[in-house]
């Protein structure tokens, strides 16, 4: 059977609340004002370095490599210490992946989240064993929307990957750059209207994924 690759944040798990909590914990240590969940959710998608850049820019701070590294380090310390208390798996996601595996599909994960934190979250939810390959935001020099991470995930699966499943503009651009079909989960962290994202199929609940795959492969 061929392979399918998933994004993580906003596609398989609703992780924004824990990311939000870790950012605010890091800022509270220096007396900084907290961000709202909506604000932090809007910063998610391009990996931790860009998340922190956006936090600093929103605070009106000029770009500074030392400041970036310092806040990023404290954010990661908080996030890795408590990555999943407020996180949830989207309804039907685990069942959909287990069904695909039962049919013989190879399953990959391509995310801009650091690979260690990704594995930690998957393990906490009992999902780690379901993935044959995992590429994170620190696995390669490039991050999505560069196609290199998605291509590396496909190569690690050692199967023809027919679909990338994600929720955002970054994911859509990554699939397009890699020359793969893209299935858009509409309930994640995208900013633009659905019609503005290039996609070959879309779904709002993971229960719909098997039928979508059948239609795309017909």
From Swiss-Prot:
It catalyses: 2-phosphoglycolate + H2O = glycolate + phosphate. Its cofactor is Mg(2+). Keywords: Calvin cycle, Carbohydrate metabolism, Hydrolase, Magnesium, Metal-binding, Photosynthesis. Coiled coil: none annotated. Mg(2+) binds at residues 7, 9, 167. The keyword Hydrolase applies. The active site is at 7 (nucleophile). One of its GO terms (molecular function) is phosphoglycolate phosphatase activity. Pathway: Organic acid metabolism; glycolate biosynthesis; glycolate from 2-phosphoglycolate: step 1/1. InterPro entries: HAD-like_hydrolase_sf, HAD-like_sf, HAD-SF_hydro_IA, HAD_sf, PGP-like_dom2, PGPase_prok. Its EC number is 3.1.3.18. GO terms for biological process: DNA repair; glycolate biosynthetic process; reductive pentose-phosphate cycle. It is an enzyme of class 3 (hydrolase). It comes from the Bacteria. Pfam families: Hydrolase. One of its GO terms (cellular component) is cytosol. Gene3D superfamilies: HAD superfamily/HAD-like, Putative phosphatase, domain 2. Specifically catalyzes the dephosphorylation of 2-phosphoglycolate. Is involved in the dissimilation of the intracellular 2-phosphoglycolate formed during the DNA repair of 3'-phosphoglycolate ends, a major class of DNA lesions induced by oxidative stress. HAMAP family: GPH_hydrolase_bact. Belongs to the HAD-like hydrolase superfamily. CbbY/CbbZ/Gph/YieH family. This is Phosphoglycolate phosphatase. It comes from Cereibacter sphaeroides (strain ATCC 17023 / DSM 158 / JCM 6121 / CCUG 31486 / LMG 2827 / NBRC 12203 / NCIMB 8253 / ATH 2.4.1.). The gene is cbbZ.
């Amino acid at each position: 059977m061929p392979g399918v690759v998933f994004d993580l944040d906003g596609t398989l798990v609703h992780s924004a609340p824990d990311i939000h909590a870790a950012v605010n914990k890091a800022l509270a240590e220096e007396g900084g004002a907290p961000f709202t969940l909506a604000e932090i959710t809007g910063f998610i998608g391009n990996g931790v370095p860009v998340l922190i850049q956006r936090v600093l820019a929103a605070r009106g701070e000029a770009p500074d490599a030392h400041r970036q590294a310092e806040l990023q380090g404290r954010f990661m310390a908080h996030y890795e210490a408590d990555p999943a208390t407020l996180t949830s798996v989207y309804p039907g996601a685990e069942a959909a992946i287990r069904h695909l595996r039962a049919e013989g599909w190879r399953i990959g994960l391509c995310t801009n989240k650091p690979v260690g934190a990704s594995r930690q979250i998957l393990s906490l939810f009992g999902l780690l064993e379901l993935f044959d390959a995992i590429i994170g935001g620190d696995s390669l020099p490039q991050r999505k929307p560069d196609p290199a991470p998605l291509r590396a995930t496909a190569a690690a699966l050692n199967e023809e990957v027919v679909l990338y499943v994600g929720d955002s503009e970054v994911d859509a651009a990554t699939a397009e750059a890699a020359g793969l079909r893209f299935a858009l989960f509409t309930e994640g962290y995208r900013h633009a209207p659905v019609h503005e994202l290039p996609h070959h199929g879309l779904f709002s609940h993971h229960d719909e994924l098997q039928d979508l795959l059948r239609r795309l492969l017909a």
